């Protein structure tokens, strides 16, 4: 079975704040406001002591157990108590492809829209039915994604393992009865190509796999084309991750690494953030060359020299792969790519609103509102001249000190002003948010400013 396209995100810059993205209707991730239980306004996850409880079907995949363990620890960070399993729990979790006849019958009696997700890989449903919060996944990954969506609803960031981000303490957690979510991926294979990752060890790969689980990514691209036994055992088996190698995606299962199924990926498409470099297909050899040997985008003249270009097809994309050296360098971009892979209307309200929402999820609405102008200005300045290009003769991009009202001085002044605003806002933050603020906001801003001053 052939998949016609794979998107390789060579650059994940945020130069597009001037873009006007809009859409007409929601898709993939659906939030319904139809009342399903008028007797109770909210379904509380917590008991009188503030402890969250859940119940799950008897037979589940290993990745679901990993997600449950993460969820239990997440709830401890929010309520002070780890979530526990309990038969009469308000949260009822089901992995569709592992249900017994009795369990499936019980799920049908609850009225969950099983038919909407049962035939789609990685899909899930979360909603209130008969005074219970029902969580259903079509397969192992879908169930794990749904469980970790609960963590996000409770205020736990997917990046909590990578940054010093502590969720806001809560005595109770609840879901209104008139809300439900159906997650159906638009892109079948969503993942990362870890470029220059030979320094990684199994512990770091496991950490990346946890992040992928929280971001709902399911694929790792083998840039070096080599399988490592420890890598496969720790990541592929445990986290149910697909491996893309030599333009083939393989899903593995079991300790003996038996092949489950395999798909061939053709017509590799590259997505760039530079307006001068339009989206177009390039041959696999070129992309592999870029993945292995370069950490920057080719110039327009370099691209013109390539003779193996061809017309893009109009069929559906089957894979989106983000080429990164370290996922920690692009948290917003990776989150945005994941959201768009699940819902093409994720940016319906515009990029500025998306940025605001993302910061609110990390720091809360009060602090997020303060930070948003800083990050918007940071992305604007780095799009004018990206820090990675400062020491490179990247075309005619040098600043002029005597022309255009001294654009060099104005560029550096804007960085100085941004640094001052950053320090002033940092002073107003509570102590438990300053470490996360430093990692996500202050460090990138000051680093970019220092590089600009140096060059």
Model-inferred region functions:
Residues 1-10:
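Bacterial N-terminal signal peptides that target proteins for export
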Residues 63-66, 70, 74, 142-145, ...:
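Extracytoplasmic/secreted proteins, especially bacterial periplasmic and envelope-associated proteins
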Residues 178, 266, 273, 277, ...:
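Substrate-binding groove of N-acetylhexosamine-processing glycoside hydrolases
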Residues 9-18:
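Bacterial N-terminal signal peptides
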